[in-house]
Regions:
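The alpha-helix within a helix-turn-helix
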Residues: 25
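Short beta-strand "wing" residues that participate in macromolecule-binding interfaces
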Residues: 61
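Short, positively charged loop/turn segments that connect secondary-structure elements
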Residues: 19, 29-49, 54-58
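Short, cationic-aromatic polyanion-contact patches
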Residues: 64-72
């Protein structure tokens, strides 16, 4: 799964809960949404994906490293 899609899915499942990027990464890996053996620099990709999603307005950035699914 694409890292952006994985981040959106994890944040969507969290509902109104604000998650740190490390929690998003952990949940994506635990749910096997991202394969760390076939994806290079998983950590960097998740951080960059979350930043890009926030810039696109698809997720809300709540603070340094904190993200939440966009309401509505």
């Amino acid at each position: 799964m694409d890292p952006k899609e994985a981040c959106l899915l994890v944040l969507g499942e969290a509902g109104d809960e604000t998650l740190h990027w490390t929690v998003v990464l952990d949940r994506a890996l635990t749910q096997r949404l991202i394969d760390p053996f076939t994806t290079r620099d998983v950590r960097g990709l998740v951080v960059k994906s979350l930043a890009a999603l926030a810039k696109e307005g698809r997720v809300d950035k709540q603070g340094t490293g904190l993200y939440r699914a966009r309401a509505g």
